Amino acid sequence: MVEPISKSTKRETIQGIVRGIRQDIDGYKQLKSLLKRQRELMQSRDNQGLHHHNEHQSRLCHNLMIKAGERRRMLKSLGFEATAGGMRSLIERLPEPVSEQVSMLWDNLISLVKESKQMNESNGKLLVGQQEVINQLLQRDEQPSVDYGDKR
């Protein structure tokens, strides 16, 4: 049987969730900047710079995933589903001035996540396009070429 958590523990947990959302907003702003830089490195074909950049970007993404997991755990500890819907339910149950502020923060975070996903998908398409060009060039070099009846 699960014991109910105290009022002060609930308050601390909610404060932890809000603090985490604020930190994630900063993290996703940083991720958007990194995704923009990643695209620039890909376009300039800076493989060494891209390698170092991607290590940094991967660490940030890993940290964001850990923080999302912590938020899910905190939501569950408060009796809410560990989903965006659970977060909305929590926000609706907060007192009015607080719920409005947390709702704005949450909406901002969701927007940044969506923008980051779109940028990442765009970078993925650029990478696929670059790989296709490289493959076409490699395949062309493997096939014997004939110009005016003479092999090159």
For the regions a protein language model found, what residue spans apply to each?
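Extended, charge-rich alpha-helical scaffolding segments
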Residues: 2-89
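Short terminal interaction segments
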Residues: 2-4, 86-152
